Every structure is written in C-alpha cells, then in structure tokens.
Amino acid sequence: MKNNIITLTQSLIQRPSISPDDQGCQQLIAERLQAVGFKLEWLPFGDTLNLWATHGEGKCIAFAGHTDVVPIGNESQWTYPPFEARIVENMLYGRGAADMKGALAAMVIAAETFVKHLPNHQGKIALLITSDEEAAATNGTVKVVETLIKRNEKIDYCVVGEPSSATQFGDIIKNGRRGSITGNLYIQGVQGHVAYPHLADNPVHNALKFLDELTHYQWDKGNEFFPPTSLQIANIHAGTGSNNVIPGELYVQFNLRYCTEVTDEIIKTKVAEMLEKHKLTYRIDWNLSGKPFLTPQGKLVNATIEAVKKFTQIRPHLDTGGGTSDARFIATMGAEVVEFGPLNQTIHKVNECVNIDDLAKCGEIYYYILEKLFNEQ
C-alpha cells in the first residue's frame, strides 16, 4: 500500500485546496473508490463540496477527513514549494501533508485495498470527506451528519484522520474532545468627556470586578478523562481611540474549553448571574462550536490501540486535549469516534511535512482496524 498512499498524497497536495475550495481532490478520490465498487453521493452545501462514499450494508465503519488546507503564509519562507509535494530524506513536504491529506490518502488506500481483498465483506465501509474543516466548518461534516440523521442512516464507528501524534508516531489516540463556547459580551455605559466623568458612565471601570471574577472562577476540577474547564479572554475593546473620550461600550470576547463536568447551559447561566451581581447593563451573544464528547474504551478504542501497538511497537496514550475537530459532529450520532493520524508538529506551519514511513503505517493501521471490527461483528 505504501507507494499508492504516497502517490495519492502527492497528487492531493499538488491541488491547492485552500479552505473551502476542494480543487478537484474529492473527484480524484471518488474515481478510485468508484473503481472498486463504492457508491458515491455528492453532498454540496454552499461553497463546500462533501463526499459520502459507501461499500456494503450493515454496521457502519467510517473514515472521516478533509481535503481543505490552511493558507501557506509567506511562500518565500518555504524551503520547498508548498504545493509541489517534494520528498527529501524520507519527508514529504507540502501544505496539507500532515493536516490531513496524508492520512486521508492512507484511509482511501486502506479502504480500497480492503474491498479488493474482501468484496463481500460484512458491514458497511464509508468515507465522509469535506472541503470545509479548516475555516468556518459550517457547510461540511456538520451538514453531512444532519443529512444522514434525517434519513436514519447511522455511523457506528468512525476514525477521523487528524494528526493526533505528538512526539512520536502512534503515541496519541484522541478519544474525546473538550467542548468550545465563545461569549461575545457588550457592556453598555454612557459616552462622555474624560474631564466630566459625572456626566458619563465608564463601562470599563464598571466591568473590572466582573472580569476579575470571571477569569478567576473555578468551573470544575476536571475528571479522569478531561482537564479542568478553562476560560480565556481573547479580545477586548473600548473607546474611540481618543484620550479625552470616556467609552460608551466595552466589548469582551472570551472562550471556554469545557469538560463533561459542566454544560453550555450551566456556563451561560453562571455568566449571567455574575453580570447581574455586578449590576451591569449588557448584551451577550453565545457561539457554541461543539459539545464535549468521550469515547470510552470499547471495540473501536481497543482495536485502534491494538493496531497502533502492532505497527509501531509502542502503546498509545488516550488523550482528550487540543482544539476542536469534525469528530464533535460525528459523535452526536452516538458513534464511537477516535482520531488517529501522523505527527502534528508541523501542521499549519511553514515547511509542513510528514514522514512517508509513518503514512505507510497509517494505512496498515486503518486496514487492521477494519479487519478487527468486522471480525468482531
């Protein structure tokens, strides 16, 4: 499988698919899958292209990934052209090499090889591929999941090919993620001249005690699977830019990465209580990016651990840290979900790269997971 994985990865990298532009990546994948009997369903939403490809019937084992990549930044800082896909000393360089065209290619080749060997396999193999993960993530996996739910189509197990490995290939399997919720808070005051404060009402001064309480509040202590919930102020702004004007409004944007000990409703209620306690006039808009999820040790987690040990000779660690991914949408279907892929040390950076031997092992691991889960049905 190794040569096929590397060749497909290079072909995908050579298509400059800056999110949400697919640039023909999914068509390339679709042609390979269709050639071995996969049924293809195109699910475009807005500016996003999505592919749902299936083979067989029954319990569904899905692979999920994205063809879109982040911008390259300053191209002059790249040692090798970001869309050339050059291999140097066993490292494949290019935007998307690690996040996540390499893992996506490994998934496609693993599924393709599996159905060639076992065309009448048990269950259903599916690939869910989107071009909207790196940017808004509004017309991609979330919309495909909504479509599947509406027609009572289920995913039982799902491997998301995000680059999960941290310092050594295979050291981390993500079996959950924290939730993410952002508050956009507008605290009202009365604008005026700084020389006449009695004729104004400074929202910055009024908010200081509230902000101190908000940033020091302990939401929970975490649990055996998740670290404690954390809150960070991301943006804050007030004033006109002039030094003689008391601002009329203070804008504060803050984000919480929260564990399963709290809910988004608990967070909203507590923040409202704090605001009322400090007698602030305010408006707050909430944006829930994703709820926390956890896949406990079971068939999928155990199969993934076994596969990683077999092909890397190390025992992976289960982890729920990091940012959000499309796994959060798939988890809402009740699926067992894990994320596993190559090293994440160069993702979104200049000179993004991946070890081609790691990509080959990715393919072997994905193939083994299919074997293991279908044999246990």
UniProtKB/Swiss-Prot annotation:
Q: Which GO terms describe its molecular function?
A: acetylornithine deacetylase activity; cobalt ion binding; succinyl-diaminopimelate desuccinylase activity; zinc ion binding
Does the record carry Amino-acid biosynthesis as a key word? yes
Short name of any one Pfam family annotated for the protein: Peptidase_M20
Residues that hold Zn(2+) 1 according to the record: H66, D99, E162
Cofactor stoichiometry and binding remark: Binds 2 Zn(2+) or Co(2+) ions per subunit.
Q: What is its EC number?
A: 3.5.1.18
Belongs to which family?
Belongs to the peptidase M20A family. DapE subfamily.
How it assembles, according to the record, is: Homodimer.
Record function comment? Catalyzes the hydrolysis of N-succinyl-L,L-diaminopimelic acid (SDAP), forming succinate and LL-2,6-diaminopimelate (DAP), an intermediate involved in the bacterial biosynthesis of lysine and meso-diaminopimelic acid, an essential component of bacterial cell walls.
Q: What is this protein called?
A: Succinyl-diaminopimelate desuccinylase
